[in-house]
Amino acid sequence: MTNQTTSIPLHDRIRLIRIQAFFRSATGNPFSLVLGGGLSALALTSVGVPSYPLRVWFALILLLSGLIFAFERFVKRRGLTQENAGSLFRRRVALGLVNAALFGGVIGLVPEGTAQTAYLLVFVVVSAVAALGYMSYATEFRYGLAVSVLTIAPYALFCFYRYFAQGDAFLLLTGIIALVWQAVVVSKALHVSRSAV
């Protein structure tokens, strides 16, 4: 161990290790999100959601995922050091949260009168994105929690809004299930995160 390494406080070294683990875990996620977004757009179109807004939504997912991929390659080339890790981590988190918000916002594209299947499809999508946030980034629980809030909360709130507007008990039940499911996932993710670095 060098003098330079030993001069770094322990909590700073642990923070660097956690950020390095975060970036390692992120490898491949942009492709997963593009694939998931594309399949979601096709599935939602098939159950009556208008195709044009879904194409725009998917184009934004594609663009942002491309930016994340390019940024991660930049970080890999540059390397993570004690000096740059914090700022690079914050930029990557910002990009990831914008992408999560896009996935969370897809529920707003479901028009009134659409088949209940559309709501279930969106639930599968946002749950998968939230789970990906927790599983891939166990060393950064707060990031996973933010992804969850940006994906599941809009979905549940939209279902509750539609329930009060339309009186469809299915939407009330779906919103409740989304919140209960996330409470279960959050508790498990917190346990895993505490056992990480």
Give the positions of each predicted feature.
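Membrane interfacial helix-start motif at the N-side
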Residues: R18-G28, A138-F141
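Hydrophobic alpha-helical transmembrane segments of multi-pass membrane proteins
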Residues: F23-G79, G175, L179-V180, V184
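Juxtamembrane helix-capping/reentrant segments at transmembrane boundaries
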Residues: L80-G96
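Short, Lys/Arg-rich, polar N-terminal cytosolic tail immediately upstream
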Residues: M1-F22
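Short, glycine- and charge-enriched coil/turn segments that flank and shape catalytic ligand pockets
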Residues: K76-N84, Y161-Y163
